[in-house]
Amino acid sequence: MNGLNHNALTCSAVPIPPWERSLQTVEAQPYFNVSQASLVLEGIVFDRNNNLLFVDVATGRVFKLTPERQLSIVLKENSFGASGLAVHKDGRIFIASVGDMQRGSVRAIEPNGTREQMIVAPDTGFLVNDLVFDNQGGFYFTDSRGNSADPQGGVFYVSPNVGSIHAILPGLAVGNGIAIDPVGSQIWATEHAKNRLHRVRLSDATTVAPFG
């Protein structure tokens, strides 16, 4: 009796599904070696000068890599931790943090790492994982609270004047990554504990569109 026949496409521990094998692909290549140590790097975003910014999750450090591939540390001391970055239209760097997994925050620093300002304080109770700005200067962030059986997280919006926080997509099981389209009419957010990607259509910055 003949056994099952496998090839390079099917013998992997995580084979590519048949309906995805004909999609166009590109293989990623190493770009820059940040460290010989094993670091968890996240929050990749470009600033206004085409520098690549990212964080070391374990230490909360914020790195900058120039187009010439010169690496420097923008923020060396960060007891709050870091999990995501976004750049305000005025150039400030906003840092998302889950903190000690009990009290997260959003803080802003100048491009050179100085003048730290608290935007979303730890006592608000959010575990801020990631964030993204809209065209008005407000930002959406994901909240990583909860688990698959107790979805306490979600997507929230902070107004441009940082005067209020609005719930946009509550009830997520560990909100994670977030992105927005160029005109601010749709956001995408991942729900880590349930392996879901949500697309949300918006009527305005704080209102989900009908059937959105």
Language model segments and positions:
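A short beta-strand motif characteristic of beta-propeller blades
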Residues: 27-34, 69-76, 114-122, 163-170, ...
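A short loop-to-beta-strand structural motif that recurs across blades of beta-propeller domains
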Residues: 61-63, 104-107, 153-156, 196-198
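Short loop/turn segments that connect beta-strands within beta-propeller blades
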Residues: 65-70, 109-114, 159-163, 201-206
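Anionic-ligand binding region
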Residues: 193-212
